Amino acid sequence: MTVLATAGHVDHGKSTFVNFITGQETDRLKEEKTRGLTINLGYTYFEFKNKIISIVDVPGHVDYFKNTVAGFANVDGIIFCIDSVQGWSNQSEEHFQAISNLKITNIFFVLTKTDLLDTSIDRGFLEKKLNSNKLINYTIEEFSYKTSDLRMFQKKIVDFFKSDTSENPNSLWIDRSFTKDGIGKVITGTASMAFDLNKIYLARTNKLLEVKEIRNTENIVKNTTTTSRIAISLKKNIQDEIGRGDLLTNEIVFSGKYIFAITDKQASKFNKKGSNRLFIGTKNQIVKKLEVVNNSEKNLIFMELPNNLPILENQKILIQNLVSNEFMGGKIAFASNNNNLVKKFFKELRKTESINLEKTFTLLPENLIENSRDYINIANKYLSKDRLESIIKKINENIETINS
C-alpha cells in the first residue's frame, strides 16, 4: 500500500479529483455536503493492478489548517491540486510550505478544470518554483473531470509513487476515532513503513494497546511492510480517552514539555515574535517559549510546551509563526521534564556565544553528535570518550569519599 494526502487551496478540486480517481466521496459530514467544503479529513482508496493507493483528503480552507497538517502525518507523498483558472493561491503556498518543511518530497501536481476556456495557470512559474527546491521529485498533469481517462490517471499515480522515500520513525498518529455498532471503539491512522502491528504501545501511558482486530481497507491484517492506512478496533477496557493526536509506538517513549529540535534551516532567521504553533504528527500545541540555540554543529532550537508530549527521536515537526505565517521544519533531538537541566542549559547559553552541547548535557542522542566513533553508546545515548575518561578520573580521585 502507498498512502497519499491531498493538498491545495480551497475549491481547487481536491475532493472532485479524489472522487474521480476512486469513485468515492470523502466529504461525510452534513456541513461538508451542505457547504461543498471539506472540513475534516476524508479517507478512501483505489486499486490498480494489485497495487492499493490510499488517500487522505485534507481541507483547503485556511480555517481548518490544523486538520490539513494532521492529514500529512506519515504519508508517502502528496496529490497537489491547482485550479487552472485561479492559479497558485494563498493556501497553495501555505500547503506547499508545510509540505516542504515536513520534507515530503514526492508531489504529484494536478492542474484541475482544464476544460474551462479562461484557464490562466503559469506553468513556467510553477516549474521554476519547484526546481528551486532540489529535494522535490514532482510531475505535473492536466485534469478535466469531463474528458480525462480514469485508468490512465490511476496508472500515472501508481507509476510516480513506485519508490518509497519517506523517513518516519516507527509510529502511527491517530487521526480519527469513532464507535461502531457491534464493534466498539475504532481508531485510525497512517502507520509508518516499519510499524509493527503485533506490539503497539499508547505513548501517552506507555501501556500495550489491547487490540481486538486490525484492518487496512477491507482486509484483516497481522503485519505490514509498507506505509498503510490502519483501522484498529479496541477491547472495551481501553475505549475511553483515546483519539486524534494520540501516538502509537512500538517502544516505550519519554514524554516531556521541554523540547530540543534540529531545524532544516538557519533558525536565527525564523521570526519568533508572536505566537508559534508546533505540529507533530496529528497533534499540535501553542509553543510557550521558543529560543534559538547558538551551536556550531547544528541548527538547534529549544521549545517549552504547555503540556507534556510523547517524543520520538527524529520525529518530523513543523513550526508555524501565527503572525507572519512563516514555517520552519525539523526533527526532534530529545525532550526533558527536568527543570533544573533546562535552567543549567540557559545559564550556559547566557555565558557563551556558542554552547557546547556535550558539556551541558553529558549524554546526547545520536542525531546531535558528529562522529559516533568518538563516543560510547550507553542505553542508546552517547557519551564522548574524553568525557567518560574525565568522569572516571574524578571518581577515582574521590573514591574514598564515595565509599565512606
Task: Cite the ranges covered by each PLM segment.
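C-terminal effector modules of nucleic-acid-centric enzymes and ribosome-associated factors
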Residues: 6, 106, 116-122, 128, ...
